[in-house]
């Protein structure tokens, strides 16, 4: 009487939620957040590294980011990487630091960010549905092999479906929250 590992399914669904949270955290809203610079990578010491491995990122003011670069020789590379990151940011070099003013988001940019958030949520939902499918396939196989009975298979299948529904509604809730945050002027 085994069936499938419901804890493994829950863990994988939680992983999809965490990946989604990480994706939407990097979307720029009206407020400054150090996460905005998460997608920025720098050519440093012979490889591409995330910005947070060569500098401290701070939020000194609501519409300003500060980047304190540890290695003076990296200032130009960091400046270039931020400018080329398609985030629409223009850093101001101040010695070994960069100040990055965050411009107001116009309506068009807000709508495109909401669209990107929807794409991230769809990607997360697809991942969750794959986990559900794997679980259901495991149940069918276990039932076919005689490892579990039809009743237990149905019971576990209902649990997997409930987990799926709960996880997808959590994604929808997080998306609605982020959408509201982006559209707020």
From Swiss-Prot:
SUPFAM superfamilies noted in UniProt: Ribosome recycling factor, RRF
Please tell me whether the keyword Transmembrane is annotated for this protein. Answer: no
CDD domains, A to Z: RRF
GO terms, biological process: cytoplasmic translational termination
Q: Region Disordered: list its residue ranges.
A: 137-166
The cross-references to InterPro entries, in alphabetical order and at most eight, read: Ribosome_recyc_fac, Ribosome_recyc_fac_dom, RRF_sf
Citing just one GO molecular function, the answer is: ribosomal large subunit binding
- Which GO cellular component does the record give, naming just one? cytosol
| Family the UniProt entry places it in | Belongs to the RRF family.
Q: By what name is this protein known? A: Ribosome-recycling factor
């Amino acid at each position: 009487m085994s069936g499938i590992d419901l804890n493994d399914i829950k863990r994988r669904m939680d992983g999809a939620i965490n990946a989604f949270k990480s994706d939407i955290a990097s979307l720029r809203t009206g407020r400054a957040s150090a996460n905005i610079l998460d997608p920025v990578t720098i050519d440093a010491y012979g490889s591409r590294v995330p910005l947070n491995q060569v500098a401290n990122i701070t939020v000194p003011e609501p519409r300003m980011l500060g980047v304190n670069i540890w290695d003076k020789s990296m200032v130009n590379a960091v400046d270039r990487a931020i400018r080329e990151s398609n985030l629409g940011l223009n850093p101001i070099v101040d010695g070994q630091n960069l100040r990055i003013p965050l411009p107001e988001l116009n309506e068009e940019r807000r709508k495109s960010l909401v669209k990107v958030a929807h794409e991230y949520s769809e990607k997360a939902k697809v991942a969750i549905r794959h986990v559900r499918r794997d679980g259901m396939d495991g149940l069918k196989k276990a039932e076919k092999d005689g490892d579990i009975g039809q009743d237990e298979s149905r019971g576990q299948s209902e649990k997997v479906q409930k987990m799926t529904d709960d996880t997808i509604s959590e994604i929808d809730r997080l998306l609605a929250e982020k959408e509201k945050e982006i559209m707020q002027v």
